[in-house]
Amino acid sequence: MALLQTSLIWAVYAIVVAVLVMVASVFIYTYQTPRDRSSVVTFTCIVAITSLLATVLLLPVDVALTSSTTSSKLGQRKPWATQDEVDKIVSLLTAVYYLLYSLDAFLCLLAIPFVYFWYEEYDEVAVESGEQSAAKRLWTAFKYTISFIAIVVVLFIVGFLVPVANIKDSKVSDYLRKLLAENRGERVLTFTLGLLITMGLFLYILYTSTGLAVLPMRMIRAAPSVSDMTWKASTSAQLESNRERQRQLEGRCRGDPGLLSSKERRELDTLVRDERTLIRRQRLAEEADGEGQSRFMRAWLKTTAFFRPLKLLGGIAILLITLMIWISMLLTAIDKAKNSICKQRCGYILSGIGVFNPINWIFVQSAKVFPIDYAVLTVVVLLLFGSSVVGISTIGIRFLWIRIFHVRKGHTSPQALLLTTAMLMLTILALDYSIPMLVAPQYATFGPQTFCDRPQGQQSDCLTNKHLIKPCSELTDNTAAKRVCTPSVTSMFLNRVTISYPFFGTVFFWSQFIFLVIYLLVLVTSFIRHPKLDERLLDQEAEEAEEERLLTSSARGVGDTYQSVGGRNNFSTRAG
């Protein structure tokens, strides 16, 4: 029975990973530009995003496997769950986490930088002339990546040398003391994980909080589209006015612009440029209405218009979910600030839940029937991931106030895509702390596990005394709880980071308040401000689409000419 249950849990995880591959693929193919696609860049981005999401979504497997050793109705371990069996489960999960965290660090710190430099080194002219070989390109990319290798080496050295905290507080339980990184290998991984989460928190605070507020508001109060009748009428009126003014100026000079004054010539040049822009806008509006489109596209446009009310309902549902997440995080943060056993000395670790947390309660109850909790957590994680993507596309990739790259659907360059993937990886690592430690701390630590709170020597289960069944907690001194309760490996990893290096724990904790404040400010701003159509961005996209259309038509023309010339040559050869 135990083997069957364990196999089913891992089978569900395999299905979820397959879904994550599809999610990552859809994201990458949706955002990358069709003109500059690179299979290596695409593959790297998909693997990196899948790996990080798989790490976060290993949590329900962790909780399900550790909770499968106990009976929550009786508050005792199941007959098969000997300490050896429990240790095997914990060891397997620990090995999987080590593998995933190591893979995540490798992809983020080495693989993505290498692929970025490898793509940057590509020179089409040099390749065609034979000046740039594949080996030379790889070597140049490796030379640039050496700086990142040096960073990894420094991290390893610092992780080896930095001493862990010396916890002397008598209130700290033996369980937490045992979490202190004991060997050098654990110290390196613990320190590196803490540093990467800290880096990710800055992105999480800026992008995820913004996206979490903007996403539902975009669905509820969508900006006017190019198919909007008012916008179309305004564009047509502007185009007609523009052409009328051009006719006046051309009539004044009788077809010879040299007769116009310098001011009028500048005005005419501006009118010609504006006319091209207005024609592009008019073409976009016609395409949005299905004119000149295939039957499939016209059917798709009608379907999306029909289901537009569902978008409004979806936006309201997402808004309610995000507000519930915000409230749950705020309640847990206040609970940590008030009831943490050793405050900043151990990174604000919370050993027991003192405040009701709605999201945590939903997870604990759903965990009793696996995989309901898995489905709920997957929705929450993908919502936060999607919010991070929306935040990055809204703000863009910036250095201070300078925008380096735009991230837009169908217009994201491979370099921007790699940087976005690296940012998302760090953001997801920050989520890997926030979800278990603030959104659902009890669920992420013990799940639905309970113990029978009876004095030692009495009956070990509470079959006849249901009121003595209590949820597992690190704070309890009952030996039965220590014998029955098994904390998740996720909670052990994260608590080890915060208790071994309290500085990280303090940064993790206070950054959550900044996240909550920024979310609230952006949400209020989104409520007040009415969304507008970004005509500048629209013109840029229309210009890029026109350039791509011209390039495609010219390439097709060259191909037809080549075929016709080849056909004539073949005919001449046969005739000869």
From Swiss-Prot:
GO terms for cellular component: vacuolar membrane. The keyword Glycoprotein applies. It comes from the Eukaryota. Residues 561-576 have a biased composition (Polar residues). It is found in: Lysosome membrane. Its main location: membrane. GO terms for molecular function: cobalamin binding. It is a multi-pass membrane protein. Pfam families: LMBR1 (PF04791). The chain crosses the membrane at residues 8-28, 40-60, 98-118, 145-165, 188-208, 312-332, 347-367, 377-397, 419-439, 503-523. Residues 549-576 are annotated as: Disordered. Keywords: Cobalamin, Cobalt, Glycoprotein, Lysosome, Membrane, Transmembrane, Transmembrane helix, Transport. Disulfide bonds: none annotated. Belongs to the LIMR family. LMBRD1 subfamily. This is Probable lysosomal cobalamin transporter. It comes from Aspergillus niger (strain ATCC MYA-4892 / CBS 513.88 / FGSC A1513).
